Regions:
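Conserved glycine-rich cofactor-binding loop
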Residues: 10-12
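Short, small/polar-rich loop/turn modules that mediate ligand/substrate recognition or access, typified
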Residues: 79, 164, 169, 236-238
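Substrate-binding pocket helix/loop in short-chain dehydrogenase/reductase
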Residues: 89-90, 97-102, 206
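C-terminal substrate-recognition "lid" of short-chain dehydrogenase/reductases
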Residues: 110, 214-243, 248-249
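Active-site helix of classical SDR
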Residues: 113, 148, 156
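Alpha-helical segment proximal to the catalytic Tyr-Lys
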Residues: 118, 161-165, 234
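Residue(s) in the substrate-gating loop at a strand-loop-helix junction
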Residues: 132
Length: 258
């Protein structure tokens, strides 16, 4: 018996993934810095177990892996989903903001992967690193976030190169807009600026040029993560999987033509 570990498991994609895996019969350990949302998610399913820890803290994540292994016999998979947003250009980003953004979006994944590697080798397990389409392109005034999400893809490729022959699979997942509490906050920025009258209208605005014409539900991204963790994807390794409703295939200069 083994379990999956999900960082950033208290809300959004992490919480949806925990529920999906638990519904499939897997034990799941969700990790985050805030106890309240973790406990709320854990209360929804007997197979979801909460541990409050900072995923960027090496000692804390080593303890999470040790506790998971002691209780469940090993680690079957890791979902590195912790992250955070921020708004600034390179010129307006302070040293502290830069460090904070990289810690939230890159260091958390590095530390979690490093902590879990030995157990994942033992179980021949899988890792999914949740990046973003911000890891493939750049939005405005999101310097730290954009750099961190790009760097995650490099991290995935490095681990894939070094640990594939040791039995560990790893892939990056780049979602587009997903309906999560963090995205709701970003929609609220558009509302406050007067670009949209409400959050729903803001989602419609940001997905106007997405070929599927909508944001994803967190469950749709969770299903992609479950696929990448599972036996149907055993030859998918070191890949960057994009789940964005088609937004990154759009030829932007042709938008004027409809």
């Amino acid at each position: 018996m083994t379990a999956h570990i999900i960082t950033g498991g208290g809300t959004g994609i992490g919480a949806a993934t925990a529920r999906l895996l638990a519904d499939a019969g897997d034990d799941v350990v969700i990790v985050g810095r805030r106890a309240e949302p973790l406990l709320a998610v854990a209360a929804t399913h007997e197979r979801i177990h909460a541990i409050t820890a900072d995923a960027a803290d090496g000692v804390a994540m080593a303890d999470v892996v040790a506790s998971t292994t002691e209780r469940f016999g090993g680690v079957a998979g890791l979902v590195a989903n912790a992250g955070g947003h921020g708004y600034s250009t390179v010129g307006s980003t302070t040293d502290d903001e830069w460090r904070s953004s990289l810690e939230a979006n890159l260091t958390t994944a590095f530390v979690a992967i490093r902590a879990a590697l030995d157990e994942l080798e033992r179980s021949r397990g899988a890792i999914v690193v949740v990046s973003s389409i911000a890891g493939l392109a750049a939005g405005p005034e999101t310097a730290g976030y954009t750099v961190g999400k790009h760097a995650l893809i490099g991290l995935v490729r490095s681990v894939a190169r070094d640990y594939g022959r040791r039995g560990v699979r790893i892939n990056a997942l780049c979602p587009g807009w997903v309906r999560t509490p963090m995205s709701d906050e970003e929609m609220s920025v558009l509302v406050q600026r007067g670009d949209a009258p409400d959050v729903e209208s803001a989602y419609a605005l940001v997905t106007r040029d997405v070929p599927l014409g909508r944001a994803a539900d967190a469950g749709e991204i969770a299903a992609t993560i479950a696929f990448l963790l599972g036996p149907a994807s055993t030859y998918v390794h070191g890949a960057t999987i994009v789940a964005d409703g088609g937004s990154t295939i759009v030829d932007v200069p042709t938008l004027a033509y409809g």
